[in-house]
């Protein structure tokens, strides 16, 4: 009976083990990428209406928080969007638009993620946009 019980435990232990496809360990770092929007005089502008879209034109709900980094800073993308990217590292376009109702600032950005989908990476895109 004892041998049967131990055999049963060994079988359960072997079945419950799983193999991990990738060795992924994400850090607690939370990445977000900002853009500064300025007027024609180069003065940062707050309180703009922001629209962010993916490559298919679908609008992304990117939370815009007040940043301690100064006026006119807007979040383009953050780590909460890693799942929308391919783990293959292929960059995808993100379109950013800010308006005060009469003037518009537009920017195109390229982002990707790591193979574990832990963090986003900004591949290209402006740091500053001007309202025109």
Name the predicted role of every residue range.
Residues 1-18:
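Sec-dependent bacterial lipoprotein signal peptides
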Residues 37-38, 53:
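Hydrophobic alpha-helical segments, especially N-terminal targeting/anchoring helices
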Residues 42, 57-60, 103:
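Residue-level signal for glycine
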Residues 98-125:
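Structured interaction patches on ligand/partner-binding surfaces of diverse proteins
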Residues 15, 22-24, 84-86, 114-116:
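Extracellular secreted precursors and ectodomains with disulfide-bonded cysteine-rich loops/domains
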Residues 17-32, 38-41, 120-132:
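Beta-strand-rich domain onsets/edges
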Residues 48-97:
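Tryptophan-paired
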Residues 41-47:
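A short beta-turn/strand-edge loop motif at beta-sheet boundaries
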